[in-house]
Amino acid sequence: SGSGKSTLLHVLSGLDRPTSGKVLIDGVDMFSFSDEKMAIFRRRSMGFVFQQFNLLDEYSVLNNICMPLRLDGRKPDETFLAEVTKMLGIEEKLKKYPYELSGGEQQRVAIARSILAKPHIIFADEPTGNLDKKAGEDTLNLLSSCAARFGQTLIIVTHDLEIAKKADRIIKIEDGKIVSNQL
C-alpha cells in the first residue's frame, strides 16, 4: 500500500500524466495526443477493471457492459456480447441492476465491460480486493482466460503475491521505485 502501484497503472493507462518520461504504446507517445484523441484512444484501446467495480446502479447490467461502446458511438457486436457474457456466466443477468448482484457477479460485469470493446490492453487495479477468496480466484481465472482467448494484454496491480505469481512478468514496486522486474 502506498508504493505507487496504482499511480503506475494510472500513468500507463493515460489517466494521469507522468512527471517525466514517455508512455509508448505501439511506438506512439500517448501523451502527445490532444485530450479528445486521448479519450478516444483509451475507449478503443483500453479496458479497465477496478477494485470498486465502478458500475452505474441506475443502468442495467447490459447497459453497464455496453457503456464504453455507446460513449464511442458504436453498437455492440451481438455475437461477441453473447460469447463474452456466456463465458463469464452472466448471460442470464443482463436485465438486472448492479445492486441486485453479488460482488463476484458485479466484478464479472466489470470484466465484460472491459472486454466488449475488444481493447488491446486491460488494466485491472486490485480486481480481487473486494472479493472473497473463491470469487477472487474465479475473477483472476476469468480475466486470464478472456485475455488469452481474445488476444489482449492484461496488466494487473496487486499486493497479493499469490496473484502476482500467476503473471508472465512481475514488476515489484517499493516506495515508487521498481525494485525487481522478472519474467
Regions found by a protein language model. Give the residues of each.
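H-loop (His-switch) and adjacent beta-strand-loop-beta switch element
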Residues: 170-182
